[in-house]
Structures are given as C-alpha cells and as structure tokens.
C-alpha cells in the first residue's frame, strides 16, 4: 500500500499454532487413561494417581502387626491357664482347714492329695525334745510339790503341858522346901569372889552375914 500512515499487521497464524503445541506439551495423559494431568501445577484432573508403592508404609508392615497380635494372644492364654490352675487348686482344697478336723500336731503339706492315710498326718516328735520336755516337767512338779501347802491340814499348836505340871508341883511343896531351893539357886560368896574385885560391894558382905546366921 502506498500511503502516508503506518500499517500494523497481526500474525494470527503464529499464535494459533502455538496454542495447540502448548496444550500438547503441557498435558500428559494419565497412565490409567482416566484423565489428563498438568505438569508442575499440582492439580489433578480426573482420578488421582496412586504414587504409593506396593510395599507397606514406613509405620510398619502388615506381617509385623500380625506377629505382635499372636504374641499378645499367647500371653493372654498363659495368664488364663495360670488363673485356671489356681481355681482348680482352690476347688480341690476343703472349705475348712485341717486343724478343725484333726487335733494335735500335724505335718505341713503343699497338697492334701499327697496324704495316703491318716497315719501320715501326725507330726513325728524328736526323742531328744521329748526327753528334755519331760525333765523340765519333773523339775517344775518337784518345786510345786515342796512349795504347796495343804489348806485342809490344821496348823500345829504349841504344847504347854510341861509348864502346867511344874506349876502343880510347886503348889504341893512346903514353904521350907521352897526356901531351900532359893538358897541353893543363889550363888555363894566364894564363887562370886572369883570374879573381878571391881564387882565387890558392901551388899555382898551383908548377904554373907545373913547366910551365916541362917546356918
């Protein structure tokens, strides 16, 4: 064109050719054929693609969880067996103790089913302990015998018969005989002279003179 003004031209063919190429390059068909996904957009169209592998997650494998369940079941079974054994033991034991059925010393049994006869129940006594117990019993019996007093026996009373006889005999004697006995009982001056001179007094001379006059 010949003219004075500038001319503008738009190449539509270039933009039109770019659009399908961008679409072709940006869109990637899904492996499963269910939809298209755009690279780098982070937005999924259609069904989501499963990126998880066939292996298990990082938390744990299914095989490990099954093994743990089996171990816990075994532990529970063992506990149940223990409780069952205790229950069976309680059922086998009598409701009352052995002491209410047997008087005396008995052996200690872990299981009453071990008793074959009644003769096995009493406890055997050591002969040395029996001898020692008898000796202690005899000593205590002797002490109690000597210290024991019969309450029915009457206490012994003092006898005064001899004194009564002497008083009766004195009543029968005359006054002269009594005087002779009194003189005989008095010690003579000669016997008293043998004593120390410090004991000599005038009263002794007077007594001697009286004795001479009586003679």
UniProtKB/Swiss-Prot annotation:
**Motif Nuclear localization signal at which residues?**
129-137
Q: What's a single GO CC term here?
A: nucleus
Annotated positions of the Phosphoserine modification? 188
* Organism superkingdom: Eukaryota
Annotated region (Disordered) at 1-132, 150-183
Site keyed Critical for interaction with HDA19: positions: 188
What do we know about what induces or represses this protein's expression? Accumulates in leaf blades but fades out from stems in response to cold stress. Rapid but transient induction in leaf blades in response to inomycin, an ionophore of Ca(2+), suggesting a transient Ca(2+) influx.
Task: Report if keyword Thylakoid is assigned.
Answer: no
Q: Where in the cell is it found?
A: Nucleus
Subunit note: Interacts with HDA19; Ser-188 is critical for this interaction.
Protein name from the UniProt record: KID-containing protein 1
